[in-house]
Amino acid sequence: MSLMNDPRPVSKKAGAKPVYGKNTPQFTKTVGEIVNALINAYKEGKKVNLLKIKTELAAKNSLSDQPKSVDIISAIPESYKNTLLPLLKAKPVRTASGIAVVAVMCKPHRCPHLAMTGNICVYCPGGPDSDFEYSTQSYTGYEPTSMRAIRARYNPFLQTRHRIDQLKRLGHNVEKVEFIIMGGTFMSLPSDYRDYFIRNLHDALSGHTSNNVAEAVKYSEQSNVKCVGITIETRPDHCLKLHLSNMLTYGCTRLEIGVQSVFEDIARDTNRGHTVRAVLESFQLAKDSGFKVVAHMMPDLPNMGMERDIYGFMEFFENPAFRADGLKIYPTLVIRGTGLYELWKTGTYKNYSPDSLVDLIAKVLALVPPWTRIYRIQRDIPMPLVTSGVEYGNLRELCLARMKDFGTKCRDVRTREVGIQEVHHKIKPDQVELIRRDYVANGGWETFLSFEDPKQDILIGLLRLRKCSETSFRPELKENCSIVRELHVYGSVVGIHNRDPTKFQHQGYGTLLMEEAERIAREEHGSIKLAVIAGVGTRHYYRKLGYELDGVYVSKYLG
């Protein structure tokens, strides 16, 4: 029995004061005293130093270790939970963007282009044939999401339930959930497995046992825990019309597409199994279907070099044929068992130095337009598994610090989000204005509407509006139509039926953005209909604004 779970007092030396672990009366007493101290501080309007309270009371009651936030949260009376949870919330950045992200993994399977090219990408770890054989393609099995998936034996229902319960115990509001389906190319799996997987994700939220995806979506729409979106990782060659239509029926609203490089020779040399031209076609098809598009890019690939890397990112941000809505930057890692590892061993390939990599990404972040969101700046592969490559676990932080040295600033969506600003810098917006930015991307006219505090450069909410192009293949979007691809109000999560004047959700920003989008669609686009790609759990919200279910979208005819 471990010290923490042993109810008996334990002392290392004879005559020493006894030390108590978990499951002892002393531990329970300490947790109760901490909760009482928090309640009293709240009643008296005092600021709380939680660490000091825990340290003092744990020492006073001779505990072997301080109580964790989970222990304290479980002891808070229901009447005080709304006021005290923000003080105890572990990792507040998890829900700072207004939603609780639940990452799940599909079962391990071989890469779809293996049959065509005879091999996987040179840098790719993981998969059934790799040194990490129980992992999914491009993962090692030691990432936090991978380990949760392996513990659940890749069961989607259990993965969802376990992660939601974990977030609840950490003090997060989980009424608005966004799924990210990871683990290789999900759309290359058999359709019956995909249906089983999606059905179980929705059933894990609603508690209903469904017979098919349509039934699961119907019950998920009425669930107390709302599925506000699903993100699917895919490749350009598995992002064609049939794939897109299937993903729309699943309730998918965002795609993560592996691009890795904007150069055809690099795509060929790294054995990607698709062309850059295929990337551009998939981007246009996806946006014309209403999806938000997030690209994966890899600096430091073989045969690139610093200047070519920077030029590649300039091309990505400035060329209208690319211009994704979001970006994940994954610097190249050398991992045992990959083709790149063999090149590294022979000296044919060498990574940038750690300082050079920080310089490169700092320069890239300065190029990011204000309508693009940088979701990640490095893989969460544990450092002991990395033979060569990124040597820091806090790469984003180091890059932002280097930008200060350069006198530049990152103005991407995530850096400016009100929730992130509040968590990291304790800054709140003062004067909020509606700001509009128009640009051309992927054969269409894009309008990026946002509520911002321009002086402090803080973003409260955004809307992405697109005039559907003539090449749109979805029947719902064939007539003269515009589509809202994203509506998001940031800040920490507020419950579906709750109001909190100190938060930014449910304060009317979303309605105002939709009204402006309707005006632009009617008066400037000349559209007769406005469609929205709405997450399954958000359809009720749009019904209140006069929208009705229209195939896989919700839409409204503009008078």
From Swiss-Prot:
Q: Where is the N-acetyltransferase domain?
A: 408-559
- What organism is recorded for this protein? Dictyostelium discoideum (Social amoeba)
What function does the entry list? Answer: Catalytic tRNA acetyltransferase subunit of the elongator complex which is required for multiple tRNA modifications, including mcm5U (5-methoxycarbonylmethyl uridine), mcm5s2U (5-methoxycarbonylmethyl-2-thiouridine), and ncm5U (5-carbamoylmethyl uridine). In the elongator complex, acts as a tRNA uridine(34) acetyltransferase by mediating formation of carboxymethyluridine in the wobble base at position 34 in tRNAs.
Q: Which reaction does it catalyse?
A: uridine(34) in tRNA + acetyl-CoA + S-adenosyl-L-methionine + H2O = 5-(carboxymethyl)uridine(34) in tRNA + 5'-deoxyadenosine + L-methionine + CoA + 2 H(+)
Cofactor(s), names only, from the UniProt record: [4Fe-4S] cluster
| All copies of domain Radical SAM core, residue ranges | 94-384
Superkingdom per UniProt: Eukaryota
Binding of acetyl-CoA: at which residues? K176, E486, L487, H488, V489, Y509, G510, T511, Y542
The keyword Signal is annotated on this UniProt entry:
no
Q: Which pathway does UniProt place it in?
A: tRNA modification; 5-methoxycarbonylmethyl-2-thiouridine-tRNA biosynthesis
Protein's name in the database:
Elongator complex protein 3
Chain sites annotated for binding [4Fe-4S] cluster:
C111, C121, C124
PANTHER family cross-referenced by the UniProt entry: ELONGATOR COMPLEX PROTEIN 3, HISTONE ACETYLTRANSFERASE-RELATED
One GO MF term = metal ion binding
Q: Which SMART domains match?
A: Elp3
Q: Which family does it belong to?
A: Belongs to the ELP3 family.
Q: Which GO terms describe its biological process?
A: regulation of transcription by RNA polymerase II; tRNA wobble base 5-methoxycarbonylmethyl-2-thiouridinylation; tRNA wobble uridine modification
Tell me a GO cellular component.
elongator holoenzyme complex
Alphabetically list the UniProt keywords: 4Fe-4S, Acyltransferase, Iron, Iron-sulfur, Metal-binding, RNA-binding, S-adenosyl-L-methionine, Transferase, tRNA processing, tRNA-binding
